[in-house]
Amino acid sequence: MSTRPPGPRGEPLLGNGRRYSRDPFAFMTAVADAYGDVIRLDLGPRETYMLTNPRDVERVLVSDWAAFGKPNLDDAVDDLLGDGLLMSEGDRWRQQRDLANPAFHARRIAGLDDAVVGHTEDALSGWEAGDRIDVQLELARLTVRIIVTAMFGTDIGEETVKTVQENLEPLGQRFEPNPMRAVIPNWAPTRENRQFDDAVATLEGVIDDLVARRRGTEETASDPAGDAVDSPMPMDLLSILLRAQNRGEQTEGDLRDELMTMLLAGHDTTALALTYTFYLLSQHPDAKARFQAEVDALDGAPTADDLRDLPFTDRVLSEAMRLYPPVYTLFRESKVDTRIAGYRIPEGSLLMLPQWVIHRSERWYDDPLAFDPDRWAPDRASERERFAYFPFGAGPRHCIGKQFSLLEAKLILATVGRAFDFDYEGSELDLRGSLTMHPGHPMPLRLSER
């Protein structure tokens, strides 16, 4: 066996960058079909390898995770997220993860059900049968308000929600695949760079306002007992971070980085997962009818305890995230020279772990492009290769907000499903890649009476 993995031939100077930037999803699918488990790509100055076998995913994310760190893909990511939990490494990451853990304890997450349902019902009060809503936009607004309440311990008004949403678009555009970014520095006074810098500054202002609102209150005073889960002190993330700052464990920059990470990562992925779920249910009337019957059987507004009575809703959400994973590929960097599937992977190489490819592969799923929620039924679970599904990552660095995101998504689905019928009235999906996978167009949903 050659020690160099196979891969597609690139263009002079641009390598595979132009093909990838035109349609990353079609490109990843095509090269996976053509070249197998380990694929060499030419996407920039670093050696890049795409891994499409779940067993290699398990190695990189779980069994040998310490040998594969988070890469610095773009200085703009540092400008946006800094040294927050998503991007930090080593002792810094361990410190921040340990600090944040109480905010994501299962008991605390379950106690957020009233806030999730309350915000959802507030949103529904502005909807009427016959309305045609952009479901992606509406869900993004809703999940911004929910994440601020859940993790910042406060609420924000409609104007602040609008400000956040308006400034997410230039951020998303900045991270869309573009081979020319390799030669255009972030400090260059291009229109895109200026819009990105302005958006970051505006969002940092929103964060600073939220912090100022809470700073110095009784809830953020230092607790001599520390931030244990059973502490009488508030366990929202902002309170925890402010108490840590009072103890000298966090700087102002640390605080901002963590809160920016949570504001952006904590709402976008959930809103997108729900957008694709409503879209898929609209395309499959039988599944929608089963979903509606299940949520109608609840005795009143859904609670965290009710989720165990919503097995089909859980399957629907899992299947939506399989077909349309909001995070469509993970990136890691090899910290050492190593071998994967017999191929040499040099230190410093960039590794792509594409959920988009693995989730949709006929190697791991029967009829992989079909929407089949019952593939997640217990009697079929053993059919699946374990790491053929990883919408939240896996291993020690899996998404810390996974359980909250799932609770939030299922409660929103149940609340909306009990209130309205819905039908998608838009065009065929045109997907765009950025930090997340999002539709490149509005997602109109027509509401009707149940």
Can you annotate each of these PLM segments?
Residues 1-95, 111-122, 142, 154-158, ...:
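N-terminal membrane-proximal hinge/A-helix region immediately C-terminal to the signal-anchor transmembrane segment
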Residues 5-10, 15, 113, 117, ...:
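Cytochrome P450 I-helix active-site segment
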Residues 17-36, 302-341:
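Conserved cytochrome P450 K-helix E-x-x-R motif and the immediately C-terminal K′/meander segment
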Residues 69-74, 92, 108-272:
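Cytochrome P450 heme-thiolate monooxygenase catalytic core
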Residues 269-282, 412:
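Short, small-residue alpha-helix embedded
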Residues 285-287, 382-385, 402-438:
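Cytochrome P450 heme-binding "Cys pocket" and the immediately downstream C-terminal segment
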Residues 353-380:
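Conserved cytochrome P450 K-helix/beta-meander segment immediately N-terminal to the heme-binding cysteine loop
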